[in-house]
Amino acid sequence: MPLIGDKFPEMEVQTTHGLMKLPAEFKGRWFILFSHPADFTPVCTTEFVAFQEVYPELRELDCELVGLSVDQVFSHIKWIEWIEENLDTEIEFPVIADTGRVADTLGLIHPARPTNTVRAVFVVDPEGIIRAILYYPQELGRNIPEIVRMIRAFRVIDAEGVAAPANWPDNQLIGDHVIVPPASDIETARKRKEEYECYDWWLCHRSASGD
């Protein structure tokens, strides 16, 4: 089972948009792969609508979105049609029709419920490296804005060599500022308070360059 910091496993998958090779299909871009337990289930349906709502925003962030469950492709297609006809939402992102091989590779099958994929999220960067993995129980839907926030934060983190505080960009202490990495030597530590806003030399912050 891959972990944070590992390369996303290479695989060819059948999707509602045809065959795809991952992660090569999205080389040079971020992508989010999310698994759902099953088609035609209530929580998953609300999640698909919510993911579609933010899909244009994700694409503006150069990030793609891919769904997955252990269902046949015709089930995915029929469910997507139902969502469009009944909920007035066209699902534009591809959904992987998995036979179980992909789910096994990614560790998405829980022994207690071997016929359904767990509710998981993999965030993969433009180099094909897994940057975050999230798991949710079947009875709890995902917080979709948090997933978008992660993409926004990772882009700033990578571009500027900084860290993002809790609840960024609405942190209780430093607002939309980002955290400067702590000094690694005495001389730099002494200069930190002159260069940045700081609570102490090891907790300094600044505005993001894009601000």
Swiss-Prot record:
GO cellular component terms attached to this protein's record: cytosol
Domain of life: Archaea
Enzyme class: oxidoreductase
EC number(s) given by UniProt: 1.11.1.24
Gene Ontology molecular function, alphabetical: thioredoxin peroxidase activity
InterPro entries for this protein: AhpC/TSA, Peroxiredoxin, Peroxiredoxin_AhpC-typ, Peroxiredoxin_C, Peroxiredoxin_TDXH, PRX_1cys, Thioredoxin-like_sf, Thioredoxin_domain
NCBIfam families: PRK13189.1
Family per similarity comment: Belongs to the peroxiredoxin family. Prx6 subfamily.
Function, in words: Thiol-specific peroxidase that catalyzes the reduction of hydrogen peroxide and organic hydroperoxides to water and alcohols, respectively. Plays a role in cell protection against oxidative stress by detoxifying peroxides.
Name of the protein in its database record: Peroxiredoxin
